[in-house]
A protein has these predicted regions:
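Proline/glycine-rich low-complexity loops and linkers
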Residues: 40, 100-133, 137, 221-295, ...
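Gly/Ser/Thr-rich loops at beta-strand to alpha-helix junctions
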Residues: 24-29, 77-78, 153-157, 214-215, ...
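Phosphate-binding and adjacent anionic-ligand microenvironments
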Residues: 206, 243-420
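Short glycine-centered, acidic/aromatic-flanked micro-motifs in structured strand/loop junctions
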Residues: 20-24, 149-151, 221, 305, ...
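N-terminal small/polar loop signature for handling phosphorylated ligands or for N-terminal nucleophile
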Residues: 17-81, 162-220
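Short glycine-rich phosphate-binding loop at a beta-alpha junction
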Residues: 15-23, 47, 146-148, 249-255, ...
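An N-terminal, well-structured beta->alpha segment
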Residues: 1-37, 41-42, 122-147
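Gly/Ser/Thr-enriched, mixed-charge loops and adjacent short helices
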Residues: 82-202
Length: 420
């Protein structure tokens, strides 16, 4: 890591340069110049990848060319948000303790009211080629699919065309005209309506949607069905098991993954281990167990044989390879997953208390779990960033799910004082 003035950020012989990448937000170039200027104050060089993806920065950093990586992005958030994701020399996100130390050092510097240093940057065009070449080499091409791809007016606009062109796919592009302010705006993995409509209109084989920094991907089948991260985990997990490449026959998912995924994996002799929400926790469990596949319903999927983080482009090419090699359509493949009715309710609260101390809430949770048995799930947790209690229920019928989400949410409102 780099820190105080005079520090040199290298580990195990890594170079003395830091890689900087960004998505398409209008504030990106200014922030990149500020980061480079700050590094120059401690005699550390910077290489600028320009517009690239978060997993692209992670890959390039772990090749050993750089001491660390910095991705300037706010992922799926609106254009006016932005932030810094710092990647270690090994390609992983920083540990919480290291992030906290960096934040403390930044706070110390800001308290001194010193003038910031900007450093003009020139994009190194060779870096994207290294990343796209690597992705293309993880699969055996070509792909003869007709695809519709939504780049979310974000990072994928610079990377995806070269990759899918090399792999031979015919692509109709949407969400591929960034202007600095339209990243994630009614497009990308959080807004699948336009993608679904275009897939149906063009009779494409399937559609792919990335988010702003392309660390996640969601899909739309030829019939217009949304194919989420759960479905990808099932298809990839069962494919890896057939190839005898799934250690301990285990897939890592989160508490939000549908019970239908768990049942489908179990039918193939695969255990699903759940973690708290967040790709960070998924990765921690993967490393702990030596698992090679894990992810979230939201489309963050980690193939640890190839990447240290969720990678939307990698997920896309791996899914396409599975579909091609199966000789079936995506619709036919995902038909094996029977999702249980699921409902998520957010309850805005005035204050928090440990859920275990809320007697009436616990009583409702236990009653729901008794009624569902092994045919349902109850997940109640607080948001990590907002004053919300989240109630997620899965069960055999929509009627039962509605009943229990309503009862548990009402108990939370009574205990913690609902707002609004």
């Amino acid at each position: 890591m780099w820190a105080r003035q005079g520090a040199v950020p290298y580990q195990d012989g890594a170079g003395h340069e830091v890689l900087i990448g960004m998505d398409t937000r209008e504030s990106g170039p200014w922030l990149a110049a500020q980061v480079a200027g700050g590094l120059s104050r401690v005699h550390v060089g910077a290489r600028f990848a320009g517009i690239t993806t978060t997993p692209g920065v992670a890959y390039l950093t772990r090749t050993g060319l750089f001491a660390a990586g910095v991705m300037i992005s706010a992922s799926h958030n609106p254009y006016y948000d932005n932030g810094l994701k710092v990647i270690s020399q090994s390609g992983y996100k920083l540990a919480d303790a290291v992030e906290l130390e960096l934040e403390q050092l930044m706070a110390e510097w800001l308290s001194k009211n010193e003038e910031a240093t900007e450093k003009p940057l020139t994009v190194d065009r060779t870096l994207d080629h290294l990343y796209t070449n690597y992705l293309a080499e993880t699969v055996s091409g070509p792909f003869s699919f007709h695809l519709v791809i939504d780049c979310a007016n974000g990072s994928a606009t610079e990377i995806a065309p070269a990759l899918f062109g090399r792999l031979g796919a015919r692509v109709d592009w949407i969400g591929s005209a960034p202007d600095g302010r339209n990243i994630n705006l009614d497009c990308g993995s959080l807004h699948l309506e336009n993608l679904r409509q275009r897939v149906l209109e063009t009779r494409a084989d399937l559609g792919i949607a990335f988010d702003g920094d392309a660390d996640r991907a969601l899909f739309v089948s030829g019939s217009g069905k949304v194919v989420d991260g759960d479905a990808v985990l099932f298809l990839a997990g069962s494919s890896l098991k057939r190839a005898d490449k799934l250690p301990s026959n285990t897939v890592i998912a989160t508490v939000m993954s549908n019970l239908g995924l768990q049942k489908a994996l179990e039918a193939h002799g695969i255990e699903m281990v759940r973690t708290p929400v967040g790709d960070k926790y998924v990765l921690e469990e993967m490393l702990k167990r030596g698992a090679v596949l894990g992810g979230e319903q939201s489309g963050h999927v980690i193939f640890s044989e190839y990447a240290t983080t969720g990678d939307g482009l990698l997920t896309a090419v791996r899914l396409l390879e599975i579909v091609r090699d199966s000789g079936q359509t995506l619709d036919e493949l995902v038909d094996e997953i029977k999702n249980y009715p699921q409902k998520l309710v957010n309850v805005r609260v005035k204050h928090r208390r440990p859920l275990a101390e809320l007697d009436s809430v616990q009583a409702e949770i236990q009653a729901a779990e008794r009624e569902f048995g092994s045919s349902g799930r109850v997940v109640v947790r607080f948001s990590g960033t907002e004053p919300l209690a989240r109630v997620m229920i899965e069960g055999p019928t929509h009627q039962e799910v509605d009943k229990w989400t309503g009862r548990i949410a009402e108990a939370i409102r009574a205990e913690l004082g609902a707002v609004g």
